[in-house]
């Protein structure tokens, strides 16, 4: 789709915002882009035809997205933030690390990330982020 889309799940604190690269400025004008979160930049490798992805995290999505304008491969962005302001840097690094691990294990994408990430969280925070991650996967696959 060539427009900006959002997604939420009932009783979940997260929110997704997605759209094509051509709509990036419109996406970055949204209030959600001022929050910490995780994001995916996706495209297709023109030589192999295989999907490519870069997985990242940021304290301010908007600022980090502008840093990726020099990466030519991506055509679509989707990012996830918390509606209740409860995602911390440690949370986003934990989520990023888990998502990179999952993507490597699935072996369906060419992963653009060169550095692994991750963060150790207290057990209760890790459990909360695993629930958040399950919802991210649910929306991403929809």
Question: Can you name each region flagged by the protein language model?
Answer:
Residues 1-36, 44-51, 61-142:
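Boundary/linker segments flanking structured domains
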């Amino acid at each position: 789709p060539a427009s900006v889309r959002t997604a939420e799940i009932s009783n979940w604190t997260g929110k997704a915002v997605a759209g094509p690269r051509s709509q990036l400025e419109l996406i970055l004008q949204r209030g959600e882009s001022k929050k910490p979160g995780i994001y995916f930049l996706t495209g297709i490798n023109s030589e192999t035809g295989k999907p490519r992805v870069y997985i990242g995290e940021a304290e301010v999505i908007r600022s980090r997205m502008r840093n990726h304008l020099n990466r030519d491969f991506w055509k679509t962005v989707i990012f996830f933030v918390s509606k209740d302001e409860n995602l911390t840097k440690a949370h986003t690094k934990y989520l990023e690390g888990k998502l990179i691990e999952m993507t490597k294990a699935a072996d369906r994408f060419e992963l653009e990330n060169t550095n692994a990430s991750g963060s150790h969280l207290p057990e209760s925070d890790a459990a909360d982020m695993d629930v958040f991650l399950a919802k991210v996967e649910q929306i991403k696959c929809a």
